């Protein structure tokens, strides 16, 4: 109506004209803000870097997410004509004509039903969820909370609105899936177990006695098991099922930092793993060389011990944890996580594929898978409550990672710990365990208990998508 009034009264408004303009709109709003990203007005720095011909008349450009990564594919190419004119500017003939090429159509792998289920399961807590298809690497869901409405950025956001987002202590603009760096805690114990088996340091039957702590030879310091009373004699099945720290302290020490680093790096930890995700962090997989270069200090045996339970210098993203777990599910076959399902009808190609994780004895994959199933389905499994009543087999691993250090001899006391200093809760899992079709990684900041808090989130998401993915009832 307002446009019509201006058009009718345009003779009274010299210098005013109505110009139609296409503007990007995100109908799902905050639901896909961290995966799709958003476009925004081209700033001065971007204007200098862009092709002035290709972007003539263009006012917006991809700023984050898929919008940023696939900017050139989505933008297309401008058309133009070269003409001959007379002195008055009248066109005499067309010398050359080039048709414009529209941007490519990109179909994403995200499942809106699964995305909604993941958001509902996570609730209002700060954290992230990422779900992958281990057979293809397709990202089925990506949630980072809190989120924001990307439509705010399309035509320009006010300073006040941007400051409210940027300065928020909850960091809604921060993509926790790709950029959040966290200690993985016990979620990496399956990968450490693979390292122990493949290197020959242990067998599935090797037993370690757990009195509730571990001590390095000739050292007094006690590295505590989460179960302070101890689990007694434990083999690999029991160690994974009970998330026994003492077993993995011992295993990490036997492996040594060099072998432990090299094996974990094969699973993508400490490096970028995605095919098409903007701003992904590499994380940190520490080594002796890294510490010498950055800290100018030698590597100490105790640092290897705590690395065996995902503590210390190590930092990973939730996406890396999902990918490492996908490799367990997929028996070492690498498929880089990606958001684009097709580009103009063609699936994206990984031009720099990662080498598969090849074990000396492929049966070791089944051994670790079995231990992860015990986590969920054995009466003593650490996350058995999360799998109660499930009509399919789940393989999972919980993780509870310290945010601040606790002194020797002290115990974690949530009532004396600031909310944002409380432990992070993590969980990774896949289902159905025998023929995995989905891998899920959940991280809840300051959630405290991986099995008790993050585990039910994974279960709720799996239940929501089970019928659609036709899982066998077991």
Question: Predicted regions span which residues?
Answer:
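Periplasmic/cell-envelope proteins involved in peptidoglycan metabolism and beta-lactam response
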Residues: 1-159, 181, 199-204, 209, ...
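Beta-lactam-recognizing serine transpeptidase/beta-lactamase-like catalytic domain environment
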Residues: 85-97, 134-187, 191-442, 471
């Amino acid at each position: 109506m307002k446009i019509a009034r201006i058009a009718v009264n345009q003779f009274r408004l010299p210098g005013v004209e109505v110009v139609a303009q296409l503007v990007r709109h995100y109908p799902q709003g905050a639901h896909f803000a961290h995966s799709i990203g958003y476009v925004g007005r081209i700033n001065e720095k971007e204007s200098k870097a862009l092709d002035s011909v290709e972007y003539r008349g263009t006012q917006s450009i991809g700023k984050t997410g898929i919008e940023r990564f696939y900017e050139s594919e989505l933008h297309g190419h401008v058309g133009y004509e070269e003409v001959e004119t007379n002195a008055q500017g009248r066109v005499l003939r067309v010398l050359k004509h080039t048709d414009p090429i529209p941007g490519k159509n990109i179909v994403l792998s995200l499942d809106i039903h699964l995305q909604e289920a993941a958001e509902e399961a996570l609730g209002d807590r700060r954290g992230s969820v990422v779900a992958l298809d281990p057979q293809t690497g397709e990202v089925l869901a990506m949630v980072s909370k809190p989120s924001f409405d990307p439509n705010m950025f399309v035509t320009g956001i006010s300073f006040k609105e941007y400051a409210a987002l940027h300065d928020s202590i909850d960091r809604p603009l921060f993509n926790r899936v790709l950029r959040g760096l966290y200690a993985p805690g016990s979620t990496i114990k399956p990968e450490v177990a693979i390292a122990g088996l493949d290197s020959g340091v242990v067998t599935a039957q090797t037993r370690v006695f757990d009195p509730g702590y571990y001590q390095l030879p000739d050292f007094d310091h006690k590295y505590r098991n989460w179960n302070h009373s101890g689990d007694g004699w434990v083999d690999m099945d029991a160690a994974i099922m009970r998330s026994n720290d003492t077993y993995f302290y011992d295993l990490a020490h036997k492996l040594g930092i060099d072998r432990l680093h090299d094996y974990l790096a094969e699973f993508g930890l400490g490096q970028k793993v995605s095919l098409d995700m903007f701003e992904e962090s590499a994380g940190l997989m520490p080594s002796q060389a890294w510490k010498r270069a950055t800290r100018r200090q030698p590597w100490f045996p105790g640092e290897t011990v705590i690395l065996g339970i995902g503590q210390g210098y190590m930092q990973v993203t939730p996406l890396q944890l999902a990918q490492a777990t996908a490799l367990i599910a997929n028996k070492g076959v690498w498929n880089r996580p990606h958001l684009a399902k097709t580009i103009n009808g063609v699936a994206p190609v990984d031009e720099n594929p990662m080498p598969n994780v090849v074990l000396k004895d492929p049966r070791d994959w089944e051994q670790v898978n079995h231990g992860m199933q015990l986590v969920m389905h054995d009466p003593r499994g650490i996350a058995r409550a999360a799998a109660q009543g499930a009509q399919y087999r789940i393989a999972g691993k919980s993780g509870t990672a310290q945010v601040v250090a606790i002194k020797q001899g002290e115990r974690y006391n949530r009532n004396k710990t600031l909310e944002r200093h409380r432990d992070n809760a993590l969980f990774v899992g896949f289902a159905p365990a025998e023929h995995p079709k989905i891998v899920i990684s959940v991280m809840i900041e300051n959630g405290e208990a991986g099995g008790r808090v993050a585990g039910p989130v994974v279960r709720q998401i799996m239940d929501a998508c089970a019928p659609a993915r036709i899982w066998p009832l077991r």
